[in-house]
Curated annotation (Swiss-Prot):
Top-level taxon in the UniProt lineage: Bacteria
Assembly and oligomerization: Dimer of large and small chains.
Xref: InterPro entries: Acetalactate_synth_ssu, Acetolactate_synth/TF_NikR_C, Acetolactate_synth_ssu_C, ACT-like_dom_sf, ACT_dom, AHAS_ACT, AHAS_small-like_ACT
Pfam annotation, one family: ALS_ss_C
Organism ancestry: Bacteria, Bacillati, Bacillota, Bacilli, Bacillales
UniProt-listed CDD domains: ACT_AHAS (cd04878)
GO aspect biological process, one term: L-valine biosynthetic process
Family: Belongs to the acetolactate synthase small subunit family.
Gene Ontology MF, one: acetolactate synthase regulator activity
Protein name: Acetolactate synthase small subunit
Domain (ACT): residue spans on this chain: 4-79
Amino acid sequence: MKRIITLTVVNRSGVLNRITGLFTKRHYNIESITVGHTETAGVSRITFVVHVEGENDVEQLTKQLNKQIDVLKVTDITNQSIVQRELALIKVVSAPSTRTEINGIIEPFRASVVDVSRDSIVVQVTGESNKIEALIELLKPYGIKEIARTGTTAFARGTQQKASSNKTISIV
């Protein structure tokens, strides 16, 4: 089962390595990781999209993550109302004669062309993973040279009451 787990951590060298080591040790496949600064100086947010077997595995993983010294908060936001986004850059084979056609394909996705060369264009698209996958499928017939994706980043929408199913543990 796919889970979205967010962590706030002290921004220090080696923190990400120790955290990913826990996933490796327990044989969990990490689909994506995003890391960035937060509104608080010296604190970063990490968003993991990870595959686990069941609820017990999620609880065990959450407990193990919270034992890490530099981890401030761990939240499994999978079942919450969340805002999630991913960015993809897609380099597509494009002769000048096909550019208008490709622009017609990317427009409904609110994607944009961010680079043009003689034989290719680079398309930028943001949104949920399924939206990005759909655009990639439509662009495949033209020939995709490269794809770079950021991975999912997410957090809970607005102010939410904590449901009993939310797995939020904070150690500060």
